[in-house]
Amino acid sequence: MSLDFKKTLNMPSTKFDMKANLVEKEPLFRKKWLEDDIYQKVLKNNANNERFVVHDGPPYANGDIHVGHALNKILKDIIVRYKSLQGYYSPFVPGWDTHGLPIEHKMLTESKLDRDQITVELLRKKSRNYALKQIEHQKKQFQKLQLFSDFSKIYITLDKSYEAKQLKVFKKLALDGLVYKGLKPIYWSPSSQSALAEAEVEYETVTTNSIYVSFDVTKSTFNKVPVGSKLVVWTTTPWTLIANAAVAISFDITYLTVKYQDSLYVVAKNLFYNDLLEKFQWENYEVVDEFLGKEMPRNSIWYKAPLLDFDAPVIATNYVLEDSGTGLVHSAPLFGEDDFSLTFDNDLKLIMHISDTGHIENSQTKYDSLFYEEANKEIIKDLAEKVVHVYTYSHSYPHDWRTKKPIIYRATPQWFVSIDKVRSKIVSELQNKVKTFPEWSKNRMISMIENRGDWTISRQRTWGVPIIIFYDENEKPVINEEIFDHVIDLVANHGTDIWFSSTVDELLPEKYRNRNWTKENDIMDVWFDSGVSSIAVDIDGGKTTLPFDVYLEGNDQFRGWFNSSVINAVAYAGVSPYINLVSHGFALDGQGKKMSKSRNNVVDPLDVIKKYGADILRLWVANSEYSSDVHISESILVQNSEIYRKIRNTVKFLLGNLNNFKYDKDLKLTSIHHYINEELKSVKKEVLENYDKFRFINVIKVLNRYVIDLSSFYFSVTKDILYIRKENDEERQMVLKNFYEILDFLMLALAPIIPTTADEMYSYFNKENKKESLFLERLEKAGDVSFDEKVLEQFKEFFELRDQVNILIENQIQNKVIKRSNELELVLPETASEFLKSLDLKTLLMVSKISYGKTLQVVKFESEKCKRCWNHFASLNKEYEICDLCFSVLKDTLANA
């Protein structure tokens, strides 16, 4: 009789395709999630549970999203999906930052007009419309990342409700005495014609002409520096010499008076011997005198200002260092913080000779109308007789992060938030209430707060939230709660445009009108806009308030959004806005280089999605050590595609075998199947703990290792049980129970990272009480998972034996004694443990016979091969040439054949 034995096997069967086709499937799943309202259903299901909210730092509403955006949003989405699966109430409200110079500048460029040629109202209208269009553009791009949000609720910093809440924060800070107007040097961008905050400054290496120039002493009552001596200073900004008003020395530095070519020069001793002698190339010099800075009496030395006709003092301070220069510092009070500090106790001249555009004006010199950089050359030329040395100097110099042009320190009247009054409270919140990942970043954040100066919040621009301050008839700022509230109500109803389109009296409460008051024209720093988001964003009708569970942004935000947010939140509400502060690095190319169009190394996330699908991009994010800079390239994406393929192949195998399986939670597992189940729990706990620590790379490592181990052992040794035995065989049911629980866990564990694939897997999963989507299921919490360590420990003995046996088998195959392990007989030492003897080693080690002898060895088994299971036996059923097991399985079939 002829029987096709292959048709009698329980072969895997599933319609789950090995080919992912993510590019085609992802839009379909996105559509399904939206139509089925999955996100809202999850929120509703979890509404009364413990909350865990990731607060979105708003990207700027301008241009296409880049790979840095993708990295950031995917990291957040992994957390939101994970916590939602665990039953937490985790609404995610995406935000956009919409004010500021880039949009304003773009509108001016498109209009082909200067600021003074376009009305404020028109410029703001154009800026608003552009920002709203950009939000819609970016929203569509973000949706392609398969984010767990339906984008029905977003926050935008130009919304009038947001602006009104922002002004409430400003009001409280002003009433609490934290806001003040003052003259002090701040970062000024001539290219933007505006003040900048620290977070708006980036540094580039530049090469400039640096000079050592001497100032002639005109008066002296300090005999160690006689009249006629020359004070040598070093500067990289010759244009500031016009505003020179003092020379600063240190109390604690030792100075020399050195005679060279009939002139006396004053320099710091250590710098003279260690640096200046070589630079100046002086020979035949003579040290005439030596003194400590503190020995110089106050107001004892005066010198002629280098470019203007007045005498200026030498002042001893505690901020001058001996690490570079000459130990004597040229001080222009309106162009440097330390320089400005000299004005507090000294009656110094305050000279402002630089216009908003960076041109010299009202300087009483011939340099008027020159741009400050152009003036440098002329000044060096004109001071030739006083210049001791000139050289080119490469150094890091601040630039405007938007225009990429150099900036300067320049004192102008600005509005500030005082940090000193809230500094200790902020530091306390960071130290005691905030967890950071990576851990070292807490010290970085604390250090920034401890060392930062007051926050310049005013900007001399048009597109932004106004500083709602009025000035009385004496030009003094009016800080009045009633007036603040009145204006804030106007903004809540009409938006901030009303500040610019209305007269002063139209903005004031009636009783304050007709007083000849004026209003402030400056707008707020955009970091103040985004920095109030923890207070201004309405997540769910006011139920969710700060502190939020997670802030997650690039590590450039330590001086940006992380900084402005904690200042505003502590000043307004007395608490940190975040509980967990997570930072990531920048996305670089495969060689670790910054991406740029000029290098032709830009990786566009939308191109990656078009080629590989968003799940591969998301897998790359999860599989990156994001706490540092991350690399992305074609080869790296291919590597992640391989991991994805292994996972998909594993799931296909599981689904195929689980076809028609009915899960029985009460089925007791024994032997290796019990071990596999305990191992699953161990892996589950490890994965969940790494999710909780935001260590997604470890999640991927653990899961990847797990599926490889499953394929190499459990899947291999159970194939005969699955394929050969009767469908309802008890041990076969044990294997399938494990498969079911393994697959159930894998889908849920992978869902935060590769949501489309995970939900696709779920759609093929045979499960009672199945939900519309995997994301309506529940994932356990790490604390609820336990496993029997004794079982895992006990089986170590078996796996040590397996490693030894595999080496012996491999030798037999390489020596061409056998082709497959099931052609061998395994001889175990008679001293083998009772535990090993209790196991079905024939199945677990995939050999044909187990016997016992003096030593561990494998020998070729003289046998016959079963035509159905292909295993080897001493003898077979003569009629059908099959083994006893196969015969028992087919008994009824053969009888009826």
Swiss-Prot record:
Principal EC category: ligase
Short motif 'KMSKS' region, span: 594-598
Annotated CDD domains: Anticodon_Ia_Ile_BEm, IleRS_core
UniProt entry tagged with the keyword rRNA-binding: no
Domain of life of the source: Bacteria
Intracellular or extracellular location(s): Cytoplasm
Record EC number: 6.1.1.5
A GO biological-process term: isoleucyl-tRNA aminoacylation
InterPro entries hit by this protein: aa-tRNA-synth_I_CS, aa-tRNA-synth_Ia, Anticodon_Ile_BEm, Ile-tRNA-ligase, Ile-tRNA-ligase_type1, Ile-tRNA_ligase, M/V/L/I-tRNA-synth_anticd-bd, Rossmann-like_a/b/a_fold
Binding of ATP, residues: 597
Co-factor binding details: Binds 1 zinc ion per subunit.
Cofactors required: Zn(2+)
Record-listed L-isoleucyl-5'-AMP binding positions: 553
One annotated GO molecular function: isoleucine-tRNA ligase activity
GO cellular component: cytosol
Subunit (UniProt): Monomer.
Assigned protein family: Belongs to the class-I aminoacyl-tRNA synthetase family. IleS type 1 subfamily.
Known function: Catalyzes the attachment of isoleucine to tRNA(Ile). As IleRS can inadvertently accommodate and process structurally similar amino acids such as valine, to avoid such errors it has two additional distinct tRNA(Ile)-dependent editing activities. One activity is designated as 'pretransfer' editing and involves the hydrolysis of activated Val-AMP. The other activity is designated 'posttransfer' editing and involves deacylation of mischarged Val-tRNA(Ile).
Protein name as catalogued: Isoleucine--tRNA ligase
Source organism of this protein record: Mycoplasmopsis synoviae (strain 53)
The encoding gene: ileS
